[in-house]
Amino acid sequence: MIKARIRSQCENSNLGDYEKVYRSFSWEKFSEQLVKDQTGRIDLVGSAIDLWADNPETADQVALIVEKAGEIRRFSYQDLQEISCQWANMLSGLGYCSGDRLFVLLPQGPEIYFAMLACARLGVVFCILHSKADFAQLEACLLNGKPKGILTHPDYLERLPAEALTSVRHFLLTQGPPVATSGHEVVINEIITSLPKRCDPKFHSPKTPLYIVYTSGSTGPPKGVVHSHGDSVGIKASAYYALDLHPGDILWTDGDPGWVTGTVYSSFAPWLCGASSVVQAEPFSASTWYRTLERHKINVWYTSPMILRKLVAAGEDLPGRYDFSKLRHIASVGEPLTPELFFWCRNNLNHPPHDTWWMSETGMILVANFCTMDIKLTSIGRPLPGVETAVVDENGEPLNFLTMGELAVRPNWPAMASGLWQDRERYEDYFRREGWFLTGDMAVTDEDGYIYLQGRNDDLIKVEDKFIGPYEVEQIIARHPSVSEAAVISRTSVEGPVTMKAFVTVHSDIPPSSRLNLEIKAYVKANLSPDIPLKEVEFMDELPKTSTGKLVRRALRAKELGLPAGDTMNMTD
């Protein structure tokens, strides 16, 4: 744990005084801002799109900007209202109604967002599949979700596993002619323009399923996490406080819509706040990312340490060539920020990055370094107003600060997953300690309530009579001037106590050597504790990670045992 404290320089934020807002907060403040009927049912698209489209002062405001293949397309709130109604009318005409499921397998593009809005209007449950998902991943998701339709591109049809398509009645194609003719293809462009641009508002219970997002199961098949229309209350509150979104802001969330961050914070979150969303569909390059920040005058950028590391690798000369004067706030998600990334970002992009924490099951940001709060390096911040967290022991009892336990949340926030699709037992396991949602993340809190993650509960390393989280050891190793990244696991032996093994990648100009191996071990003992049982260091070309940049330590443990890595839903190719 690093004691350094970075003073906040944020002005005119939505949050203001954190302590005051946290004490007096009520979810009702944000619930009242949604479009509802007299029974309390929600019109999510009415709240996110129609509210602005029907107001002459905001109807022409840009809501969605998509940059793809050298072309920039802009859609106003009125455009999205009309297009989403046409898509809803198309789906309704094909027989889709509340509870049906539409899966989406597309590269980044506006059609993903048209489909999300159309489904939300009708109560159809959407699921955005990652465009790079492999055959086995697609098969697992399709067999579990049993969609009525799949929205895709003709080039993707042959990637779909035939055995998993028995429930599918329609293949909705973004262009034609189809590469195969099964009699179930519908070419959207051939029918959409003739459909009405208006549709009647539809209200749904807060408990009506909105979308499914598939995430990896460390010990089983992918989990289909179900979220509902009532999430909109928490989504808006988190975007308002954690991302500090104002009406008219331009937000760029650079996560793929196949991951929950992209699903939530590139669509409904900015629109519920009256902001614009930027979608960059080009492959990553540092110049493309910098150009996007400059060209689209981004005010709020929601990114990840994985992206920041790539920018660091591209060098410090590039940022100075671009104008970031419109950028006001940078937020990060996926893993805790290292001090090195924090200071690089602050020094080269002129703004400190603010960590956020949440997971697919929480549906919204729950913990953040809010822009009005001082930042403590390596801390993910403090709970969002309205969210109660604690670090608890194995019995669910809250622990004192600076004592490691499992991060838990009182299950009263409005975006909590309503279930796991077709898997009630695994869902109920999150609540196995009465009164708490157990996150699986190990953490400690300090005297000011800041939270520090220590790894997943199955990543903990038991040394003599205490548990050690791998994250702190990895951070120390990563500070060695020759090291790029590190991952740490435990090793057991019948001959003696538990020890640690580190997997390390070094900078491109540094050759691995036995001398460096010894140096790293000594560095950890000197900078953390002489009792740390780091017995082995193995150099690797790259570490196994999810596509959002998280280390997959179980893959390293499996490697040590000569076993398969398990489900790879979220791992890179």
Label each residue range with its predicted role.
Residues 60-117, 134-139, 187-190, 229-230:
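Conserved AMP-binding/adenylate-forming core of the ANL superfamily
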Residues 133, 143, 150-153, 301, ...:
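AMP-binding/adenylate-forming catalytic core of the ANL superfamily
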Residues 233-250, 257-300, 314:
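Conserved AMP-binding/adenylation subdomain of ANL enzymes
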Residues 383-386, 397-430, 466-468:
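Conserved ATP/PPi-binding loop(s) of AMP-dependent carboxylate-activating enzymes
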